[in-house]
Amino acid sequence: MGARLSRRRLPADPSLALDALPPELLVQVLSHVPPRSLVTRCRPVCRAWRDIVDGPTVWLLQLARDRSAEGRALYAVAQRCLPSNEDKEEFPLCALARYCLRAPFGRNLIFNSCGEQGFRGWEVEHGGNGWAIEKNLTPVPGAPSQTCFVTSFEWCSKRQLVDLVMEGVWQELLDSAQIEICVADWWGARENCGCVYQLRVRLLDVYEKEVVKFSASPDPVLQWTERGCRQVSHVFTNFGKGIRYVSFEQYGRDVSSWVGHYGALVTHSSVRVRIRLS
């Protein structure tokens, strides 16, 4: 009979306990965890992990890994303009965590910009037969939905208030003079009826008091002259300290007083925040 081979069991490697790591090394490890998992999975583990997630270091390490021009500029500003302690009831998470979770830069901060969700997110005042939502007459480039809001024969208006801090931009960053706020709106008219359109965008402080304003009142579109949409845009720079809100306000009506919805069409409204590169 052949000899029976014996199998030797190798001793199992001892598992690595993360809580045994030195704090500075644990921060490095946790900084590689995606932001949402860091908050929802790691923060509840223990008090030590919670303190790390609630502190700035782990989030600054995440910002430092973005080597794009915008990422490097933001990291440099963030080191100089660290957020102060905030009201825990209003902001349970630290400001840097909120920034990494919300990723506000480059994202459109206007909710429901094309009416794809009805009038959700908008404060609406109806004139004439009120606002309506229709399909675009011509495609609008980059729009998330090819739909638009349409006004009537009397002035119609709607407004959306964007809370920049709740969207992830902390106050010290807004006050740094390194932030630009870019606003844009698409508007147009039907071919068979002229219209009037106005845009007003106001930067407000924490008490919703106006600090800076941009207004646009393009020439009315006349009947049988053109159809489709065109864009109005503006960039706020050097707007000073204390800005917290953006009030985005649109107004429109037709010029023929026709019953129905023949007034200004508005769509693809946007408010975007970006870092200055120079």
Swiss-Prot record:
One of its GO terms (biological process) is glycoprotein catabolic process. It comes from Homo sapiens. The keyword Phosphoprotein does not apply. It comes from the Eukaryota. This is F-box only protein 17. Residues 99-275 form the FBA domain. GO terms for cellular component: cytoplasm; cytosol; SCF ubiquitin ligase complex. The keyword Zinc-finger does not apply. Part of a SCF (SKP1-cullin-F-box) protein ligase complex. Interacts with SKP1 and CUL1. InterPro entries: F-box-assoc_dom (IPR007397), F-box-like_dom_sf (IPR036047), F-box_dom (IPR001810), F-box_only (IPR039752), Galactose-bd-like_sf (IPR008979). Expressed in heart, skeletal muscle, liver and kidney. Expressed at lower levels in spleen and brain. Keywords: Ubl conjugation pathway. Disulfide bonds: none annotated. Residues 15-62 form the F-box domain. Substrate-recognition component of the SCF (SKP1-CUL1-F-box protein)-type E3 ubiquitin ligase complex. Able to recognize and bind denatured glycoproteins, which are modified with complex-type oligosaccharides. Also recognizes sulfated glycans. Does not bind high-mannose glycoproteins.
